[in-house]
A protein has these predicted regions:
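Acidic interaction surfaces
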Residues: 1-167
Length: 167
């Protein structure tokens, strides 16, 4: 695949599989696809208002994170973040909103992205077979979760093989 940024081959029993991590360009920004984030504006050409933080900038336009509203939401919804033992609800909400801002800012700064993991069965010559499985919309920074996904996708491929040959 042309957008694969990492590829490796793994063995499972007598079978070989190619594992590809592929940029998922079809994912919406995290604040549009997931709950639990503070309000983020569209691109706007204006100055920051009180209670806002600049999340991202490009050619004089900005996306603003409504930090004041995020803290209010965090308090009501019980958001939390490490170290998880904040002395007050206000401190917890403030820290959680700040962690949310940093998480979203990291996405804006390409410090993480969404990806797809594609597992493809390889023949004895290392060429791809028609059996594959994939999962998309995964955060790029989740190696433990990636391993779980890879194991499940290999299992899915093996299940497809056994279903095809009737074993």
């Amino acid at each position: 695949m042309s957008d694969a940024y990492r590829t490796e081959t793994r063995e499972s029993g007598t079978m070989s599989f190619r594992i590809e991590w592929v940029y998922d360009h079809d994912c919406d920004p995290p604040w549009d696809r997931e709950d639990g984030h503070g309000p983020v504006s569209d691109w706007e050409h204006r100055s920051k208002r009180p209670g806002e933080m600049i999340l991202d900038s490009n050619r004089g336009s900005h996306r603003f994170y409504d930090f004041a509203q995020a803290v209010k939401t965090a308090r009501v919804e019980g958001w939390n973040t490490a170290p998880f033992d904040w002395p007050t609800n206000g401190a917890r909400a403030h820290a959680a909103a700040l962690a949310d801002f940093k998480y979203l800012q990291a996405w804006c700064n390409d410090q993480w992205h969404y990806c797809g993991i594609v597992v493809t069965l390889l023949d004895a010559d290392g060429e791809p077979e028609s059996v594959d499985a994939s999962l998309w919309g995964i955060e790029s920074e989740g190696d433990d979760y990636h391993e779980e996904v890879i194991e499940e996708l290999i299992f899915e491929c093996m299940h497809e093989i056994t279903a095809t040959i009737g074993v």
